[in-house]
Amino acid sequence: MNVERTQELLVNMGPQHPSTHGVLRLMIKLDGEQVTWCEPDIGYLHRCFEKLAEQKTYPQVIPFTDRTDYLAAMLNELCYVEAVEKLFGDAIQVPERAQYIRVMLAELQRITSHLLALGSMAMDLGATTPFLYCWRDREKLYSLFERITGGRMLYNYLRIGGVRNDLPEGILGTPQDGEDKADKTIWGFINYFDSYVYPEWKALVTGNRIFQYRTKNIGVLTAEQAIAYSCSGAVLRGSGVKWDLRKNLPYAIYDRFEFDIPVGQNGDSFDRWWVRQEEMYQSSRIVKQCLEWLAENPGPVMAPKMPRVLKPPKGEVYHRIEGARGEVACYVVSDGSTNPYKVKWRSPAFTHLQLMPLLCPGHKIADIIAILGSIDVVLGEVDR
């Protein structure tokens, strides 16, 4: 029997599909197993964050930022509080110790976020063991975050003018701390990460031939396309563009630290994976430098003479940082009252999700999982 024509099949992946990592719906047209068209459908997790911010005081907005990208809450807090501090200008001087604590916790948060991104992507491609290792190692970091902030994922720890409280006694540890103290001291975790976690991921997954076969030359994004689509973070650097806000436009005190920017070559799913893996090691380097400074420099963690009621002068500010998924930015408008007139949030995951119609056609339906995992979207951040 001769088949003269085939009929395309329209498939809905989600919004409850386990590989979409949230309530994301992908509408896919298939010719056999080959994808001819892909369209993301979002909005299932919209919670009116930007409108709610207009009805809250400036400090009351901080917990809402935690709930955008709930896997990297500390980075969201950092973006918002630094934006508001810009509105005040020289009236608020953040103590140096608070600045180091902010950077250290931001980089530890980057490690937790990347661990989950790598672990979940590996599991979606059939590798269960790395995902379990990911949860094992993140649990150690969450124990540290809980001791410092009282929360495991949602912290409400950073403050306009500093941080809520100083670090608990003994949490820093010593450079001699080993694996047995990985969940008790920050030095213990960093030494454990450098000695076990980082080499383990490289050997178990990155060097695995099956994993490479599933990710190399899959979802290739050129540098020109990445720039045209306003990509950032690991997605942009995976395409060979050496751009990291911590280096190129330093904020906080990142200009004081020594670290490198990992850059991919081919712009495929494997390169985006590799960049995140190497970024974890660079974050470890930054944390070590913070630990050395904090051990020798006690001091206040909140700006002196902070007003009881925060009323920044009229004005507007746009502030951006290097988040776990790319460039997180916050546009804040002040009318001189206790509440922001407007808060606009830039989500890198929202921007990167627009790549799906570009990257998916021409690949097999199984490759969509690798492409989506390499983009690393969090639906709380996409929908806000």
Swiss-Prot record:
GO MF term list: NAD binding; NADH:ubiquinone reductase (non-electrogenic) activity; quinone binding
Record-annotated membrane-spanning stretches: none
Keyword Ligase among record annotations: no
Enzyme class: translocase
Subcellular localization, as worded in the UniProt entry: Cell membrane
Catalytic activity reported: a quinone + NADH + 5 H(+)(in) = a quinol + NAD(+) + 4 H(+)(out)
Taxonomy, superkingdom: Bacteria
Record function comment: NDH-1 shuttles electrons from NADH, via FMN and iron-sulfur (Fe-S) centers, to quinones in the respiratory chain. The immediate electron acceptor for the enzyme in this species is believed to be a menaquinone. Couples the redox reaction to proton translocation (for every two electrons transferred, four hydrogen ions are translocated across the cytoplasmic membrane), and thus conserves the redox energy in a proton gradient.
Name of this chain's protein: NADH-quinone oxidoreductase subunit D 2
Organism: Symbiobacterium thermophilum (strain DSM 24528 / JCM 14929 / IAM 14863 / T)
Gene field: nuoD2
